[in-house]
UniProtKB/Swiss-Prot annotation:
Sections of the chain in a coiled coil: none
Protein name in the entry: Large ribosomal subunit protein uL16
Gene Ontology biological-process annotations: translation
Signal sequence segment: none
Family affiliation: Belongs to the universal ribosomal protein uL16 family.
Gene name tied to this protein: rplP
CDD domains found in the cross-reference section: Ribosomal_L16_L10e
PANTHER family: 50S/60S RIBOSOMAL PROTEIN L16, LARGE RIBOSOMAL SUBUNIT PROTEIN UL16M
GO CC terms, sorted: cytosolic large ribosomal subunit
Keyword Ribosomal protein: yes
Task of the protein: Binds 23S rRNA and is also seen to make contacts with the A and possibly P site tRNAs.
Pfam assignment, any one: Ribosomal_L16
Keyword Ribosomal protein: yes
Length: 139
């Protein structure tokens, strides 16, 4: 699973997700991408499940870039614990995404294969997404 090697603070507040993504909203590396359409959290396990689904479909055909990283700790209190007594221990890591963020990029495969691989990856994610392709300009 993806997670930071070292963090300054073990626990974080939940925070708010307002506005659209203004960074990471354009294709940078590949020719095809998966863009998220709504705000939310994507866990390290969901990112890994999406990556595995895509790589299994395209086999050794193309290259995949993961454009998000889970850097926010989510805490959890043990089961059947009374309220109070402080914040729970860090349980897993999530990536905070806002609408417009490119999650994955891909190159070296056909449009149909890329679209199918991204569709398989999107099924593993909790948010609505859309397939995007690079516009090939002739100037």
């Amino acid at each position: 699973m993806l997670m930071p090697k070292k963090v300054k603070y073990r626990k974080q507040q939940r925070g708010r997700m307002r506005g659209k993504a203004w960074r990471g909203s354009e294709l940078s590396f590949g020719d095809f991408g998966l863009k998220v359409l709504e705000p939310g959290w994507i866990s390290d396990r969901q990112i890994e499940a999406s990556r595995v689904a895509m790589t299994r479909f395209i086999k050794r055909g193309g290259k995949i870039w993961i454009r998000l990283f889970p850097d926010k700790p989510v805490t959890k209190k043990p089961a059947e614990t009374r309220m109070g007594k402080g914040k729970g221990a860090p349980d897993h890591w999530v990536a905070v995404v806002r609408p417009g963020k490119i999650l994955f990029e891909m190159e070296g495969v056909s449009v149909t294969d890329a679209a199918e691989a991204m569709r398989l990856a999107a099924h593993k994610l909790p948010l609505r997404t859309k397939f995007v392709a690079r516009e090939t300009s002739a100037h």
